[in-house]
Amino acid sequence: MTRLFGTDGVRGLANRKLTALLALKLGAAAAEVLTKDNRSTSRRPVAVVGRDPRVSGEMLAAALSAGMASRGVDVLRVGVLPTPAVAYLTDFYGADMGVVISASHNPMPDNGIKFFSKGGHKLPDSVEDEIEKVMETIPDGGPTGHGIGRVIEEAVDAQETYLKHLKGAVPRSLEGITVVVDCANGAASEVAPLAYAAAGAKVIPIHNHPNAYNINDSCGSTHIDQVQAAVLEHGADLGLAHDGDADRCLAVDAEGNVVDGDQIMAILALAMKENGELHKSTLVATVMSNLGLRLAMKEAGIELRTTKVGDRYVLEELNAGGFSLGGEQSGHIVLPDHGTTGDGTLTGLSLMSRMAETGLSLKVLASAMTVLPQVLINVPVSDKTIIQTHPDVVAAMERASDELGEDGRVLLRPSGTEELFRVMVEAPSKETARRIAADLASVVAKI
């Protein structure tokens, strides 16, 4: 049986793979697993549920809430809010679990469901596996009468509570900084502009009018050209681009150059080390991070630890080691002293705070890391399980590694959310990286 959970919860085409019935069963099973140790006679368990603005979110939220209520869990619906806001509110309200209905950067027809445990923490694989097992055996019946959970619609203070948290996490004034923020017509559309303005920045929001159908539609962190053009048009100091659920942030400097998650981590790591905030002088990233990040950190006396791709694995390493900064090249940046998951708005505030602290432009700050040319090709495949061990692929990988030696690297890995294999090559020149990646991708495509 194929595993239901991917690298970031359950995700798929809404009303086909991710149906209301599946959401109902997931809600019931997750309620059983995540609240089994927190039940008492004095109160019912509580779940916080938020979503992004895509049209299927309302349907899935209703089904999911019904499933949890059927197992005796009170459901606090907080409406459209970023994923990190739901994680924070799960902890703030003392809830037993949290749920986000979002497919992040995926197209509007997709959706997803991801869970948080008590305290706002993402689930380890073992707990997700337990939820899947319970889904197969959970009975139709449940509590009756007073034992049935209530569904409380739209907690009125949820957004304001999250905004206060952001202000407290990054209190430095951003007065004098002009920022363009691309909200992807997603969960950041209200929160991000409000947070940046409250910190003192002049904010120029774009793609901040969600209508249930336009999330990630030629905008946001996967369409960085939109914020690049707006920064140049308005003469802004920088631009920030969020994804649909606002757990990631990419940046653009005043000249329109992209500053990706690796560069953002380099900037923040150096700042935190200087200020005595980088615990154990260690940064946590993934195997997809550019080789240039490792070289820059080595020069600064900072250890770089790498994990599998997925911010959940970065989080596990951060928690296990007691570290204070980690993230992904894609813009998922985690600051454990201020949150339990990647937070795009917090990242944007932290980046601008460093600009305000130093008086330096984003371009100058980003120059602390030299980015090695990198090419990434996504190859559609029918069976992800056979690719890496196929003799033709093994031989092609060996040829590429022999050619690059210590001057680059090759990485081949399956997507955790789509039927794709990702071919990534770093090399001294873009041309070399592109050629080697294309050769390897052609081999994978024939399998």
UniProtKB/Swiss-Prot annotation:
Binding site for Mg(2+): 104, 243, 245, 247
EC category: isomerase
Cofactor note: Binds 1 Mg(2+) ion per subunit.
EC number(s) reported in the record: 5.4.2.10
Residues bearing the modification Phosphoserine: 104
SUPFAM superfamilies: Phosphoglucomutase, C-terminal domain (SSF55957), Phosphoglucomutase, first 3 domains (SSF53738)
Pfam families: PGM_PMM_I, PGM_PMM_II, PGM_PMM_III, PGM_PMM_IV
Cofactor(s) in the UniProt record: Mg(2+)
GO molecular function, one term: phosphoglucosamine mutase activity
Keywords of the record: Isomerase, Magnesium, Metal-binding, Phosphoprotein
Residues annotated as the enzyme's active site: 104 (phosphoserine intermediate)
Keyword Metal-binding: yes
BP-aspect Gene Ontology terms: carbohydrate metabolic process; peptidoglycan biosynthetic process; UDP-N-acetylglucosamine biosynthetic process
Role: Catalyzes the conversion of glucosamine-6-phosphate to glucosamine-1-phosphate.
PANTHER family reported for this sequence: PHOSPHOGLUCOMUTASE (ALPHA-D-GLUCOSE-1,6-BISPHOSPHATE-DEPENDENT), PHOSPHOHEXOSE MUTASE
Family label: Belongs to the phosphohexose mutase family.
Protein name as annotated: Phosphoglucosamine mutase
Organism: Corynebacterium diphtheriae (strain ATCC 700971 / NCTC 13129 / Biotype gravis)
Gene: glmM
